């Protein structure tokens, strides 16, 4: 847990109760102290909440009846509800989760040796990356801690809590769903603290990954708040291409971004000295062998492994997916420089659950859809 206390933006529900899913362990202990209880009560309740996915105080049998009654008066455990489930032919599950009057999407990806949950951090996204479905819908708001960790809680409840099944239902969490996590640090960090906490989900810091498109000041703050694995959405070998497809690059260019990444690696143990580079393959945009040579030169001073991501289409997008032969040539160039290079296997694309396809249901405060229509650009985003 970070030494700095991170305060959620809002921890009370509409009826004035505290949602305990909004509190990390330090905050939970303060809550019980304010109730006149010993701090260890926080640990007991957290174990019920996260090890058993229990949301009923009456089922917490090692808590005395008086305290259970007091908790029911002032607190609750309320995770966001699943309103729709879609299952892919490859076993991937996508859940549409209600957050207020809107929806975000959470994706469960089971494999033989692991089960990864892709979690959203915002309703929509403000960064306008041109190849991403979420970004085309605009931005509405940040998710609360309970709405972030609640996605993990809800998924674990569905697939089977650890203490109930005897197995860990979720081995890895990736903050790669809807939104830019670094633009919601005050809620993302305490949620990740609960993921790592032994009284929470107890995940290794190497198995919780935050992905960012390059909000440099927030990345520097992250390194002082928590240690988790880092992935960066680079997607281009030079500023000219990245300015076009990842517009935040105009504010924090590649050199500035990679310098911040190296600073983070200097503070981190979770990354084992290297960052994961995410590179979406766009046909004849960033996927030529000349781009691969440029990328290798660009990353020569940044310890990393490179994930090449076949682009996943969505309606109205201006790009095409790179052919397998172009991806293969690109990969071989990078490997010739000594880079560990992996072509990511596409999962869940038949239910629009693959990388870059998450849409949810966003009330767009940025009016991006309206602006694009006024500019004559056709928008046809598939909502859940």
UniProtKB/Swiss-Prot annotation:
Protein residues bound to S-adenosyl-L-methionine: 179-180, 211, 233-235, 312
Enzyme Commission number(s) of this protein: 2.1.1.192
Bridged cysteine pairs (disulfide): 118-355
Keyword ATP-binding: no
Active site, UniProt feature: 105 (proton acceptor), 355 (s-methylcysteine intermediate)
Gene Ontology terms, MF aspect: 4 iron, 4 sulfur cluster binding; metal ion binding; rRNA (adenine(2503)-C2-)-methyltransferase activity; rRNA binding; tRNA (adenine(37)-C2)-methyltransferase activity; tRNA binding
Residue stretches making up the Radical SAM core domain: 111-350
Broad class of enzyme this protein falls into: transferase
Pfam families: Radical_SAM, RlmN_N
Cofactor note text: Binds 1 [4Fe-4S] cluster. The cluster is coordinated with 3 cysteines and an exchangeable S-adenosyl-L-methionine.
Record keywords: 4Fe-4S, Cytoplasm, Disulfide bond, Iron, Iron-sulfur, Metal-binding, Methyltransferase, rRNA processing, S-adenosyl-L-methionine, Transferase, tRNA processing
GO BP: rRNA base methylation; tRNA methylation
Cofactor(s) recorded in Swiss-Prot or TrEMBL: [4Fe-4S] cluster
Binding site for [4Fe-4S] cluster: 125, 129, 132
Keyword hit for Iron: yes
HAMAP family tied to this protein: RNA_methyltr_RlmN
Similarity comment: family membership: Belongs to the radical SAM superfamily. RlmN family.
Protein's UniProt name: Dual-specificity RNA methyltransferase RlmN
Organism of origin: Escherichia coli O6:H1 (strain CFT073 / ATCC 700928 / UPEC)
């Amino acid at each position: 847990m970070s030494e700095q206390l991170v305060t959620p933006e809002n921890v009370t529900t509409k009826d004035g109760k505290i949602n305990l899913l909004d509190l990390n362990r330090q905050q939970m202990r303060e809550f019980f102290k304010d109730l006149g209880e010993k701090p260890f009560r926080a640990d007991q309740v957290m174990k019920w909440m996260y090890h058993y996915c229990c949301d009923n105080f009456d089922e917490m049998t090692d808590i005395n009846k008086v305290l259970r009654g007091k908790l029911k008066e002032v607190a609750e455990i309320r995770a966001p509800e699943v309103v729709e489930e879609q299952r892919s032919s490859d076993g991937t599950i996508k859940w549409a989760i209600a957050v207020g009057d809107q929806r975000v999407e959470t994706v469960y990806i089971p494999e033989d040796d692991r089960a990864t949950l892709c979690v959203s951090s915002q309703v929509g996204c403000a960064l306008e990356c041109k190849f991403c479905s979420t970004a085309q819908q605009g931005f509405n708001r940040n998710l609360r801690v309970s709405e972030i960790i609640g996605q993990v809680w809800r998924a674990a409840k569905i697939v089977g809590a650890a203490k109930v099944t005897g197995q860990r239902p979720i081995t890895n969490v990736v903050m790669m769903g809807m939104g830019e996590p670094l633009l919601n640090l005050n809620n993302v960090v305490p949620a990740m603290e609960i993921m790592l906490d032994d009284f929470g989900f107890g995940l290794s810091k190497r198995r919780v990954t935050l992905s960012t498109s390059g909000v440099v000041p927030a990345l520097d703050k992250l390194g002082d708040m928590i240690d988790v694995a880092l992935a960066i959405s680079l997607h281009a070998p030079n500023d000219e291409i990245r300015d076009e497809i990842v517009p935040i690059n105009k504010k924090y260019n590649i050199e500035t971004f990679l310098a911040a990444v190296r600073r983070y690696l200097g503070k981190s143990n979770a990354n084992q000295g290297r960052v994961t580079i995410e590179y979406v393959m766009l046909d004849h945009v960033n996927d030529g062998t000349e781009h691969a040579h440029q990328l290798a030169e660009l990353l020569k001073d940044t310890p990393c492994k490179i994930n090449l991501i076949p682009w996943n289409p969505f309606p109205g997008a201006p790009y095409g997916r790179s052919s397998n032969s172009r991806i293969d040539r690109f990969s071989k160039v990078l490997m010739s420089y000594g880079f560990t290079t992996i072509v990511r296997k596409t999962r869940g694309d038949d239910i629009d659950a693959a990388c870059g396809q998450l849409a949810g249901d966003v009330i767009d405060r940025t009016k991006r859809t309206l602006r694009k229509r006024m500019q004559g650009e056709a928008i046809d985003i598939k909502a859940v």
